[in-house]
From Swiss-Prot:
Pfam families for the chain: QueF (PF14489), QueF_N (PF14819)
Listed EC numbers: 1.7.1.13
Keywords, ordered alphabetically: Cytoplasm, NADP, Oxidoreductase, Queuosine biosynthesis
Catalytic machinery residues: C190 (thioimide intermediate), D197 (proton donor)
Amino acids binding NADPH: S90, K91, R258, G259
Function per UniProt: Catalyzes the NADPH-dependent reduction of 7-cyano-7-deazaguanine (preQ0) to 7-aminomethyl-7-deazaguanine (preQ1).
Record text on subunit structure and interactions: Homodimer.
Protein name: NADPH-dependent 7-cyano-7-deazaguanine reductase
This protein's record includes keyword Cytoplasm: yes
Cellular compartments annotated: Cytoplasm
Pathway named in the protein's UniProt entry: tRNA modification; tRNA-queuosine biosynthesis
Family: Belongs to the GTP cyclohydrolase I family. QueF type 2 subfamily.
Length: 282
């Protein structure tokens, strides 16, 4: 269990509780979770973070009414900046989006502006929103993470409790390498409900070579770890930076969707540009 799982800042969340679904617009349904909850225990300070990045959300179940009452549908792309005070809690995001279903808007841009305003207010940070018509995305190929997959290793896992022990002495030699490693075995659990969160992760770095077996064991140790997606990515970045001390590091995870939403956080200390094409499990 995370050290802050019972923090009072989480007590008011609708997550894990029975809730009524509203189909008329209500911005108050959105709920934020302070990023400081997991950053403070990691020693990360808002004014001196070792990374930049965004939380990329894809909205697959977005619908509203036009001015004449005709339903509209779109796929939304949201980017929430890492400097925001709060992350957006996903169940509240889903409930908020449902509140658009029977609400009339004059045009698509009004919907986009409403989303940007409300999400920015909840997160207390910078948010950008793009809406796509379905025909704009038809035929879009399934993407993949570039890099070397480290999953096919003949190893025995006898401990799947989270630990950073595997990263101790995980680098060898003085030779500097630059490589991209990928795993599809990332699985953590929701901080509140403990429901499973499934993801793929891409790690780009420049530095002393990281032992792939130790890295895989570390990633697998998240299997019973309870944190939100964004928190897990920041923990992984921080742990790799602390124990492996790469010159450059980027960590990007794309999680499978739940409730019509997928969350894809990335953190980097260099000029990393993430691919936003959905992966095969998304």
């Amino acid at each position: 269990m995370s050290s802050y799982a019972n923090h009072q800042a989480l007590a008011g969340l609708t997550l894990g509780k029975s809730t009524d679904y509203r189909d008329t617009y209500d911005a108050s349904l959105l709920q934020g979770v302070p990023r400081s909850l997991n950053r403070d225990p990691l020693g990360l300070k808002a004014d001196n973070l070792p990374f930049h990045g965004t939380d990329i959300w894809t909205l697959y179940e977005l619908s509203w009414l036009n001015a004449k009452g005709l339903p509209q549908v779109a796929v939304g792309h949201v980017e929430l900046d890492y400097t925001s005070v709060n992350l957006i809690e996903s169940k509240s995001f889903k409930l908020y989006l449902n509140s658009f279903n029977q609400t009339r808007f004059n045009n698509w841009d009004e919907v986009r502006q409403t989303l940007e305003r409300d999400l920015s207010t909840c997160a207390q940070g910078k948010v950008s929103v793009a809406l796509y018509r379905l025909d704009e995305l038809e035929g879009q190929p399934i993407g993949h993470f570039n890099g070397t997959c480290i999953d096919d290793q003949d190893i025995t896992i006898d401990n799947d409790e989270f630990t950073t022990d595997y990263l101790e002495n995980a680098t060898s030699g003085e030779k500097v390498v630059e490589e991209t490693l990928v795993s599809h075995l990332l699985k953590s659990n929701c901080l509140i409900t403990h429901q499973p969160d499934w993801g793929s992760i891409q790690i780009q770095y420049r530095g002393r070579q990281i032992d792939r077996e130790k890295l895989l064991r570390y990633l697998v140790s998240f299997r019973h770890h309870n944190e939100f997606h964004e928190q897990c990515v920041e923990r992984i970045f921080n742990d790799l930076l602390r124990f492996c001390q790469p010159e450059k590091l980027s960590v990007y995870a794309r999680y499978t969707r739940r409730g019509g939403l997928d969350i894809n956080p990335w953190r980097s200390n260099n000029d990393f540009v993430p691919s936003t094409t959905r992966l095969v499990r998304q």
